[in-house]
Every structure is written in structure tokens, then in C-alpha cells.
From Swiss-Prot:
GO terms for molecular function: heme binding; iron ion binding; monooxygenase activity; oxidoreductase activity, acting on paired donors, with incorporation or reduction of molecular oxygen. It comes from Aspergillus terreus (strain NIH 2624 / FGSC A1156). It is a single-pass membrane protein. This is Cytochrome P450 monooxygenase sttB. The lineage of its organism: Eukaryota, Fungi, Dikarya, Ascomycota, Pezizomycotina. Keywords: Glycoprotein, Heme, Iron, Membrane, Metal-binding, Monooxygenase, Oxidoreductase, Transmembrane, Transmembrane helix. Pfam families: p450. It is an enzyme of class 1 (oxidoreductase). The chain crosses the membrane at residues 24-44. Belongs to the cytochrome P450 family.
Length: 530
């Protein structure tokens, strides 16, 4: 039976023209192509039972991005922020997820719309894990050791739980650091903003993590400073090149030089830990004799013995120091630049600080800083404008059997999920005039909510402040970081006038997929207040 006759039998109303003999090769190719396509679609559906392939992809063309940005090296490291913005408005705003390639992680991120915040808020690590994401994509195990429960317990429970006492230490260390780095210049003096941020966060960070003895050891401090400073540099060396199956081996070799500098930190730290364990084994230590630092808190943790060896604790404390020093400094330098760019808010914030400190004779306590709502608003607005250290938050690796998006789509185990922080924070439906820096934006929002009381229909704006992550797996050291920023910025405002060294406001950060790296070349000018 000919094709024409067969078609007429099945669909009698369909008129099919007679097929000429010389058209048969073309039809044969078309038929085979159709069969191949059907087989491919069928096989693809079998290989993709969760239908992840149905999630749209936002592409990042390298050549086009280099042309658009006017920067030649964007061929190798294309920007991330503009393309997440594209996906946010095209898909997330329509309540759809999308995926985008992260060159720094060599993996696709599934970027979820805001409605999934409630779902990830209380997800346990057994279902989706931030620590697993950090270990896999930041390769924390290469230089020091993977993030584990000891790190999370010390950072989240003990550092945050002892903030009341830490605040006293923090104030003293910050004041000494400012005296060293800025001094008391009576004329406007140019100083690098990154240097100020780094040294003022380093001083309290070293004291809290490593204790008074090591924090005053110049050789140890230099070793920690150099090692921590290089973590981010080494973390992204060769990350943007697809190394295939040799990736882990090559990255291990890249970190070899970095690991060589680790003994300068670990040896004295091991000695202190070993000595403390020895003293505790020989006699009872009273509460008054207990050291007040992360070393002691790590020793007190109910974890397995193999996690409490001197070497294991030392390596994990180095990981914690990265968060208390380098990460906080990277955010603080942006806040210093914002502060210098907006002198119109200085006096109002100073007045509030003086009033709050006067009400509490003990100085920078949790109680007094908790009342500094305008200073807090400034910090929140700076974080909103700069998105902290990264343009995505809520980053997790799916560790359970899957992450269900809807009835038809499940992200399988090992999928990388995230929330588009920067775009939510720049959404005019969330924050009116998002491009404008309003230092008292959050102060006014909270005042409006307080005045409206239960009658307020305002959206919960706190759910959109995502710079420190979200939910039970948000940044474990966020309360320490916020209090450090308050203390440092407050002390600077009380003691100094501050302004930009250049008339034009400098660039705040650089889009380095996925990081928003701070610009370290910005200079500010300081002058001691009369």
C-alpha cells in the first residue's frame, strides 16, 4: 500500500498529493529523522525522569558580555549579575525557577522564586545543606578541612551565645586597631579603605577565635593574616576553566603552595590546644579560670574524639577565622565607602549613638547597640545595595532524595539551589526607588510597621533582607558580624570625620561569578573630631 493510500484510509478527508519517485530519498531522510527525534525524546525523558530539563536556562554569552561590558577579560569571566537579573524578571517574577551556569563553581544553579523561601527556611541538612555546598564548591577541604558540625556549633551557638561578653572585648580591640591604623590626624589624611576594614575586623576576630595569647603573638598574627587573605584567591584559581575529570587533582596541586603556609598557623595553635588539654586532665578548672575563646568552646563540644584532636580543632578554627576576619572585612569595606559617600547622615547617627551609650554606662553592650536603630538601618541599606559578599543566597545542595518544585518537577539529589538575593533587594515592588541609597530606609519601614501595628498590610520586609542567607542554615556568624560592624562604624563616626578621597563615588564591588568582590583600591580620608 502506498503512503497516499494508507493515509487516505486512516484520514479519508485528508488529501495527500501523489509522491513522485525522485522525492522518496528526501522523504526517507525525513522519516528517519522523525524516528530518531522520537527515540531521542523518549530516551531523554527516561534519563530525565524528574523533568529538570523543562526548567529554562539563562545563557551567558562570553563574547557578547565582553562587548557589552567593554572589558576584554569578560571573555573568560563573564558577568553573572545581569543574567540573573534577566532570569529574575523573565521567570522568577512569573513564579518560575530557572537555571544558570556558575563558572566559579562549574555547575548549574537552580534559582528559585521568592515563594520557596518558606520551604527552605526550616529544611534540615538531611534534605538540603549549606555546609555540603561550601565543601563541594569552595573546596574548603583542600587548604584546611571541611566545614563540619564542630565549626557550625562553635560559630552559631557559642559565639552568638557569648556575644554579651564578646562585645566588651570587641570594643577594646577595635579602639586599639583604630589607634594603630588611623591615629589622631588633625588634617585630612588619606588611608586605604580595605586596610582599615581588614585591621579593625582582624583585631577582635583573632581575640575571639584564638584567645589573648595568640592574638598578641605577632608571628602568629602575620601567619593567620596571610593564610586567610589567600583563601579566596586560591579558592577561585582556575575555577572558571572546565578541567573535566582532572579538576579535583589539579586544584589539589594549585592549593599545594597555600597548604605550605598552614604550619605557621597550625603549629603554635596546636601547642596551645595541647597544653590546655593537658592542664584540664591534671586538675579541675574553675569557671573563672576558663579561657574565653573559640579554642575553649571547641574543646567543650560533645563531638567524637577524632574531631577533638589538636590538629582537627586547629584546622576548623582557621575556617572560623575566615568568617570572622576576611568575610566581615569584605562587607565592611563596602559600608565604609557608603558611609564616606553619604555625609548627610553622619550627625543623625552620631547623635543616636551618643544617646544610646549614655543610657548604658557599660559602653558598647548588646543592650546599647540593640537600640541603635538608625545605625542598624544604615548597615541594612548598605547590605541591600551591595548584597553582601555574593549575589545569591539560600545556597544549598540537595542532600535528600529530591527537592520538589511542583507536582511534575523534582530537583534530584546533588542539585544546587539558590535564591536571587540581589534582585529581590533591588525589586521596586519590595523597596521603592531601589537605586537610591537611603540610610534610614529600614528605620522608617520599622517605624511605619510599629505605628500601624496589627493593621499593617505591609509586606514582611525582613524576609527580603537576605544578605546573610535565610532560615536555620543562614550564616552562623551573622550576629557576630552585625555587632562587629556596628561597633567599628560607630567608633569611627564618634572619633573621626570621614569622606571620599576622590570627589566621584567609587565602584563598590566587582562581579566575579558568584562573588561580589570588594574593590580594595578605594581610598578614604579621615580627620579626628575636635
Amino acid at each position: 500500500m502506498s503512503i497516499s493510500n494508507m493515509t487516505s484510509t486512516v484520514w479519508p478527508d485528508l488529501q495527500v498529493p501523489a509522491i513522485e519517485h525522485n522525492h522518496l530519498p528526501i522523504l526517507t531522510v525525513a522519516l528517519l529523522t522523525g524516528i530518531a527525534s522520537a527515540v531521542y525524546i523518549n530516551v531523554s525523558s527516561v534519563q530525565d525522569p524528574c523533568k529538570v530539563g523543562s526548567i529554562p536556562t539563562v545563557k551567558r554569552p562570553r563574547l557578547l558580555d565582553a562587548y557589552r561590558s567593554g572589558v576584554w577579560w569578560r571573555i573568560f569571566v563573564p558577568r553573572l549579575v545581569p543574567y540573573i537579573e534577566e532570569g529574575y524578571h523573565k521567570y522568577n517574577k512569573n513564579d518560575q525557577p530557572f537555571r544558570i551556569w556558575l563558572g566559579g563553581f562549574q555547575a548549574y544553579a537552580y534559582v528559585l522564586p521568592e515563594r520557596y523561601l518558606d520551604k527552605i527556611k526550616n529544611m534540615p541538612e538531611s534534605e538540603a545543606s549549606f555546609a555540603a555546598m561550601a565543601n563541594k564548591y569552595f573546596h574548603t577541604g583542600l587548604p584546611t578541612g571541611e566545614v563540619n558540625n564542630l565549626v557550625l556549633q562553635v560559630a552559631s551557638k557559642l559565639v552568638n551565645g557569648n556575644l554579651a561578653t564578646i562585645k566588651t572585648l570587641m570594643q577594646g580591640e577595635v579602639q586599639k586597631a583604630l589607634a594603630r591604623e588611623i591615629g589622631s590626624p588633625r588634617q585630612w589624611t588619606k588611608i586605604n579603605a580595605w586596610q582599615v576594614a581588614r585591621k579593625t575586623t582582624e583585631a577582635p576576630g583573632l581575640r575571639v577565635v584564638f584567645g589573648e595569647e595568640l592574638a598578641n603573638d605577632k608571628t602568629f598574627v602575620t601567619g593567620v593574616s596571610e593564610f586567610v587573605s589567600n583563601i579566596t584567591v586560591y579558592a577561585f584559581t582556575l575555577r572558571y576553566i572546565n578541567l573535566g575529570p582532572l579538576r579535583d587533582f589539579i586544584l589539589y596541586l594549585v592549593h599545594w603552595r597555600h597548604r605550605r603556609s598552614l604550619p605557621a598557623v597550625l603549629t603554635p595553635l596546636n601547642n596551645v590546644i595541647t597544653e590546655r588539654k593537658k592542664v584540664r586532665s591534671n586538675r579541675h578548672i574553675s569557671d573563672d579560670e576558663e579561657s574565653f575563646d573559640c579554642i575553649q568552646w571547641a574543646l567543650d563540644q560533645p563531638v567524637s574524639d577524632d574531631c577533638k584532636t589538636a590538629e582537627a580543632i586547629a584546622r576548623r578554627l582557621v575556617v572560623i577565622s575566615l568568617g570572622t576576619i576576611d568575610t566581615v572585612a569584605g562587607v565592611l569595606v563596602k559600608q565604609l565607602t557608603h558611609l564616606a559617600s553619604h555625609p548627610e547622615c553622619h550627625e543623625e547617627i552620631r547623635a543616636e549613638i551618643r544617646e544610646c551609650l549614655a543610657e548604658d554606662d557599660n559602653g558598647w553592650t548588646l543592650k546599647s547597640t540593640g537600640r541603635m536603630k538608625k545605625l542598624e538601618s544604615f548597615i541594612q541599606e548598605s547590605l541591600r545595595m551591595s548584597s553582601g559578599a555574593i549575589s545569591l543566597s539560600g545556597m544549598r545542595i540537595v542532600t535528600g532524595s529530591g527537592f520538589r518544585l511542583d507536582d511534575n518537577t523534582v530537583l534530584p539529589r546533588d542539585s544546587f539551589i539558590a535564591i536571587p538575593t540581589r534582585n529581590i533587594l533591588y525589586d521596586p515592588e519590595v523597596f521603592p526607588e531601589p537605586e537610591k541609597f537611603d540610610p534610614f530606609r529600614f528605620y522608617k519601614i520599622k517605624e511605619d510597621e510599629k505605628n500601624a501595628g496589627s493593621r499593617s498590610n505591609r509586606r514582611d520586609i525582613r524576609a527580603s533582607w537576605l544578605a546573610f542567607g535565610y532560615g536555620r542554615q543562614a550564616c552562623p556568624g551573622r550576629f557576630y558580624a552585625i555587632n562587629a560592624m556596628k561597633t567599628i562604624l560607630g567608633e569611627i563616626l564618634l572619633k573621626y570625620d570621614i569622606r571620599l578621597a576622590e570627589k566621584q563615588a567609587p565602584r563598590i564591588d566587582i562581579d566575579l561569578d558568584p562573588m561580589l568582590a570588594p574593590v580594595r583600591s578605594t581610598d578614604l580620608e579621615f580627620r579626628v573630631r575636635a
